[in-house]
Amino acid sequence: MASSAQSGGSSGGPAVPTVQRGIVKMVLSGCAIIVRGQPRGGPPPERQINLSNIRAGNLARRAAVAQPDAKDTPDEPWAFPAREFLRKKLIGKEVCFTIENKTPQGREYGMIYLGKDTNGENIAESLVAEGLATRREGMRANNPEQNRLAECEEQAKASKKGMWSEGNGSHTIRDLKYTIENPRHFVDSHHQKPVNAIIEHVRDGSVVRALLLPDYYLVTVMLSGIKCPTFRREADGSETPEPFAAEAKFFTESRLLQRDVQIILESCHNQNILGTILHPNGNITELLLKEGFARCVDWSIAVYTRGAEKLRAAERFAKERRLRIWRDYVAPTANLDQKDKQFVAKVMQVLNADAIVVKLNSGDYKTIHLSSIRPPRLEGENTQDKNKKLRPLYDIPYMFEAREFLRKKLIGKKVNVTVDYIRPASPATDTVPAFSERTCATVTIGGINIAEALVSKGLATVIRYRQDDDQRSSHYDELLAAEARAIKNGKGLHSKKEVPIHRVADISGDTQKAKQFLPFLQRAGRSEAVVEYVFSGSRLKLYLPKETCLITFLLAGIECPRGARNLPGLVQEGEPFSEEATLFTKELVLQREVEVEVESMDKAGNFIGWLHIDGANLSVLLVEHALSKVHFTAERSAYYKSLLSAEEAAKQKKEKVWAHYEEQPVEELMPVLEEKERSASYKPVFVTEITDDLHFYVQDVETGTQLEKLMENMRNDIASHPPVEGSYAPRRGEFCIAKFVDGEWYRARVEKVESPAKVHVFYIDYGNREILPSTRLGTLPPAFSTRVLPAQATEYAFAFIQVPQDEDARTDAVDSVVRDIQNTQCLLNVEHLSAGCPHVTLQFADSKGDVGLGLVKEGLVMVEVRKEKQFQKVITEYLNAQESAKSARLNLWRYGDFRADDADEFGYSR
C-alpha cells in the first residue's frame, strides 16, 4: 500500500527501521491514525498506526445497543482537542512512518512524520509540545526519542499548554448528543441555513455520520436526491457490496471524511436527516452523479435546495458517457433520429386528457402521449351502472375539464414536441387491455409544459416509477412539484368538494328527442357549439354547451361526396374526393368552437343547418375548394348567392369535383333573365368607407341607433375592465376589439397576422382596414359580439359602370366619390347580384341624383353595357351621358374615344 525506503548503514550494524509512506485517511484519536495507499483500480488498502511512547486521552464512546446496562463513555479531558490537532494537520496529507513494535494482536506502533521523509515534523513531539499528550512512563531515559519527548513535555509544562494549563480541562469535554427527539422540528429550526460540521464516518457513498457544530449533535445525513450502491448485510453478519459500492464509498471518503464542511439540513426520513453537504472544492451530491457513482431518487429529489434539474443534468452526463453504474445504459430514444426526437407540429385533436394528435411538417399525423401523467379515471368497480355504456369524457370526474383545458390551449396551435421515450406495444391480459406502441413526449407551447400545467390544476396525476425505470418525462421533477402544489391547494382531483357532474344528453339519431329540441334550436338563431367528431365532409357530431346535448349535424345547401360505408355483406366504396372533403372539414373545425344555425331535421333525427367558423360558412368553404356542389335546397337560403359565387369560381378552376366541368353557353340563360323586371326600392344608408377599387361600405340607417347604443355600452365596459396590454393573441378570422387612431375601441375582425407588431384588421361596422400591433387589440366581450348585433358595414359596388384599370384614372374617380358621398346619407337600391358583392345604384339623399350616372357624366368611368331587358332604360340613360362626356372630352375622353385602338394598351376593355 505504501512505498518504502531503506536508510543507509553498514552491513554489520543494527537494522534500521523501514520508512513507509501513505495518505492519512482518518484520525482515530490523539495517538492513532489510519493511513491508506494510492488507489489503483479500486479502493486502496488501509493500515492503523499508533504513536509510540505517548498517550492521549480517550474519545467518547457510545454504549453498545446489545448491552442495555452499558453507559455512554464521555471524552477524557483534552482528548477531543488532541484529535482535532491531528485532524487539521494530517487529513488528506502524505506522511511517512516507521514501525517500531507490533503486538501479537496486530497493533502497530511507530513514529509518524509529516511529509515524504523523516526530516519532516515529528507528530508525537508536536502533540506533547502542545500539551495534548503525555510521555509514557517507564520508558528508558537514555533513548534519544524519549529525551526529545521529555524536553517537549517540560516546555509544555513551563508554558502551561494544554493539559498543563490551570483547571481540570472539563471545558474540553464535549456534550455529545446521539439522538434528536423531534428531527422534523430540528431541521425546520435551521431554516435551511448552512450548519458547520465534521464528517465522522462514511457508511456508503451517499450516507454519512456528521458532527454538527457547535452543539455536538452526532447525526446520520443522507444526501438529498441521490442514492449510491450500498453494502447488503447477509444473514451471517457479513456485508456484500453492490457493484461500485466500495468505489463510491471511497470517492466520498477521500473527499469528505473528517473534513470541515457545511450541511444544509433539508428534510428528514425515518429519523435520518436529508441534506446537502457543501465543501469548498465542490458539491459531493452532483459529483457522485456526474462520475456515475449514484442515481437520482424521486422521493427526495424535490427537497434538494439547489434545484433538481442540476441533479438530473449531472446524471444525464454520466448516462451519456456510460460511466460506472451506467455502463450498460441504453437511452429510451437511442434509436430515434434527432429530427424525430424534437420537432414542431400543429395540434389537430385532443384525445381525452393525456394524448394529442399532431400534424407534422410532412403532412403526416402522429399521436403523442404526454409523458409520465395519468388522466382522471374511475375509482372502484361499483361506480358505474353495469347496464349503462360508459362515456369517459362525461362520466369520469374531471375528464371533461381536462380535455377542455387542453382543447382551448392547444387546438390549431403549433407546439414543441420533445420525445422522452417510446412505450412498446403490450398484449392484453386478464385485467389490462392491449396497448399499441406509444410515443411519449413533453409538449410545450410558449415555454409552458402542458403536462405540468394539467397536473398543477389537479386534472391529471403523475405516474410513479420503479427507481430503475428510465422511461419517464424529462421534466419529471417539475411534474412531481406541480402535483404537490395541486394536492396542497386542493385542486381538481385533490379537491374535497363534490366532483362535477356533466349530464349530457346524446340525441344523435333519437328522432323523438330531436323533435323536442328542434324548435328551441331554430328559435335560438346562432348557437355556440364544439365539433366533437367529423364523420364526413358534411356530417359532424356537435356538443352544444348551452343546451348540454350532443347532436348529429348535417351541413345545409351542399352536396358533399359520400365516403365509404360498410353495408351488410359488402363495403360500398366512397365517391371521389370524399376523403379529401372529410380531411378538409377535420382540419378546419374538429374540436373548434363554432356557431351553428339549425334550420330543420331529417327523418333520422339529424339536424340540418349552417356552420360558421371564424366568421366563415363551412358550406361555402367546401364549395369554394371544389369539395362540394351547391344543392338545390340552398335556393331558399340567405347564403345562396355566396354559394353560387363560390361554385362559379370553383368551376373556373376545374379542380376536384369540377375537374371535368364543361361550361354551358351563356345564351341559354338569357331568356330567363329577360323575364325579370327592374325593381326600384331605395332604402336610406350611411356611407362609411370608399375602397380603392370603387367599392363602398354602408350602414343601414334603421339600425344606426342600435350600433350607437352598443358602442357606448362596449366602451363603458372596456373602461371598467380594460384589456391587459399584450395578453391577446390574434388569430385570422377572429373577431376582436381594436383601438383606432382616435383612441376609441371598435369591433374588428383579424384578416392576417404577419407578426405581433403587424396585424391586419377590418373594422366590421365601418368597412375600413388598418395594420396594428397586437398591443392595440383585445378580446371582443361576448355581450357585444356579432350574435348580439351583426356587423353593420355592408360592401357594395356601383351597377352599370366600368371602373378604369389605369391607376391615375381610377384615383380620380375614387377621389370624386369620396368628396361627394363619404360620411353622408344616401339612398341605395340593389340592381343585381354578382360574385363578390351586390351591385347597386346610389342616390343623393337631397337631390335624388344618381351618383353612378354623375360619374359617367363627368367622364370618370365608362358604362358597363348589360343586356337584361329590365335594365335597358337605365343603360340607355347611362350611354347618353357617356356620349355627352365624350363630346365634351371630359377626363377619360380628353383624347377622344381611345377604346377602338388603344384599349389593351391603356388597360381598358370595351
Swiss-Prot record:
Posttranslational mods: Phosphorylated by PIM1 in vitro.
Motif (Nuclear localization signal): 321-325, 388-392
Parts forming coiled coils: none
Protein EC: 3.1.31.1
InterPro entries membership: Silence_cplx_Nase-comp_TudorSN, SNase_OB-fold_sf, Staphylococal_nuclease_OB-fold, Thermonucl_AS, Tudor, Tudor_TDRD11
Annotated keywords: Acetylation, Cytoplasm, Endonuclease, Hydrolase, Isopeptide bond, Nuclease, Nucleus, Phosphoprotein, Repeat, Transcription, Transcription regulation, Ubl conjugation
Sites bearing Phosphoserine, chain numbering: 426, 645, 785, 909
KW Chaperone (keyword) present: no
Disulphides: none
Glycyl lysine isopeptide (Lys-Gly) (interchain with G-Cter in SUMO2), cross-linked positions: 513
Major subcellular site: cytoplasm
Entry's Gene Ontology molecular function annotations: endonuclease activity, active with either ribo- or deoxyribonucleic acids and producing 3'-phosphomonoesters; nuclease activity; RISC complex binding; RNA binding; RNA endonuclease activity
Residues that bear Phosphothreonine: 103, 240, 779
Pfam families: SNase (PF00565), TUDOR (PF00567)
Domain Tudor: 729-787
GO BP: any one term: regulatory ncRNA-mediated gene silencing
Modified sites of kind N-acetylalanine: 2
Compartment annotation: Cytoplasm; Nucleus; Melanosome
Tissue: In lactating cows highly expressed in mammary epithelial cells.
Induction pattern: Protein levels increased in response to lactogenic hormones during lactation and correlated with the induction of beta casein gene expression.
Function of the molecule: Endonuclease that mediates miRNA decay of both protein-free and AGO2-loaded miRNAs. As part of its function in miRNA decay, regulates mRNAs involved in G1-to-S phase transition. Functions as a bridging factor between STAT6 and the basal transcription factor. Plays a role in PIM1 regulation of MYB activity. Functions as a transcriptional coactivator for STAT5.
Listed name of the protein: Staphylococcal nuclease domain-containing protein 1
Gene: SND1
